[in-house]
Swiss-Prot record:
The keyword Ribonucleoprotein applies. GO terms for molecular function: RNA binding; rRNA binding; structural constituent of ribosome. The gene is rpl4. Keywords: Ribonucleoprotein, Ribosomal protein, RNA-binding, rRNA-binding. The keyword NAD does not apply. Part of the 50S ribosomal subunit. One of its GO terms (cellular component) is cytosolic large ribosomal subunit. This is Large ribosomal subunit protein uL4. It comes from the Archaea. Coiled coil: none annotated. One of the primary rRNA binding proteins, this protein initially binds near the 5'-end of the 23S rRNA. It is important during the early stages of 50S assembly. It makes multiple contacts with different domains of the 23S rRNA in the assembled 50S subunit and ribosome. Belongs to the universal ribosomal protein uL4 family. HAMAP family: Ribosomal_uL4_A (MF_01328_A). One of its GO terms (biological process) is translation.
């Protein structure tokens, strides 16, 4: 499949042939598994001190006192200790470090999931179904010249996004930023932020600095491209801006 390459003014300058990876069959099941596997590998194992709740001098007072025969503090027989239902006692079933809390995925399945997610970015119906505003986008998949990599001013990237037709989607992401319900507000994740366009480049020459302040916009190099960037929340079809160099690098990696 041939697509046009646009300059920073939104004008077509040439045509290129897309790599075969953009013809990969759509596999939402593998994409979902790969994203969840990536999530779970960020979880830190939990455990408890094996001696927690057991560092008390206790005794069993035996029967004949009109009290339950549980371990009690030696100096204060009135207070139970050590047992799970006592104040300061041990946990009944504490979390174990040995618990398997991550999900694995085979290497070939992960590779196929990334390839399928890349192909989904070129599917107009999937991009629109994901919620992106694509009415004014000049082309899907959107390929631009490598000059985009050198833009390091936020004002410049704003004008480029407007000329390429993706600014409406950034406005959507800005409007959909909401305060999170629950205690997550206190734990460093106060806002729920929508995902906007993804910019994939061959090499960062300033574009990260130029695009990072736009709501919902992510920038990543092809070599660091993962399924979480392409399908946030396990939902494939993210609106993606590819540079020409990134397309050529994809051809080298995936064919």
């Amino acid at each position: 499949m041939k697509v046009k390459v646009f300059n920073l003014e939104g004008e077509p300058v040439e045509e290129i042939e897309l790599p075969k990876v953009f013809s990969t069959p759509f596999r939402p099941d593998l994409i979902r598994r790969a994203v969840i596997a990536s999530w779970t590998h960020r979880i830190q194992p939990q455990g408890r001190d094996p001696q927690a709740g057991k560092r008390r001098v206790t005794e069993n007072i035996g029967k004949g006192h009109g009290m339950a025969r549980v371990e009690r503090i030696k100096t204060s027989p009135r207070f139970a200790a050590f047992v799970p239902f006592a104040v300061g006692g041990r946990r009944t079933h504490p979390p174990k470090v040995e618990k398997i809390i991550w999900e694995d995925i085979n290497k070939k399945e992960r590779r196929l999931a990334i390839m399928s997610a890349i192909a989904a970015t070129a599917n107009y119906d999937l991009v629109r179904a994901r919620g992106h505003v694509v009415d004014n986008v000049v082309q899907i998949p959107l390929v631009v010249t490598d000059d985009l990599q050198k833009v390091f001013k936020t004002a410049q990237t704003r004008e480029i996004f407007k000329k390429l037709g993706v600014w409406d989607d950034i406005e959507r992401a800005k409007k959909n930023t909401k305060i999170r319900a629950g205690k997550g507000k206190m734990r460093g994740r106060r806002y729920k932020k929508a995902k906007g366009p993804l910019i994939v480049v061959a090499k960062n020459e300033g574009i990260v600095q130029g695009a990072r302040n736009h709501p919902g916009v992510d920038v990543v190099t092809v070599d660091n491209l993962g399924v979480e960037y392409l399908a946030p929340g396990t939902h494939p079809g993210r609106l993606t801006i590819w540079t020409k160099g990134a397309i050529e690098r994809l051809r080298e990696i995936y064919g």
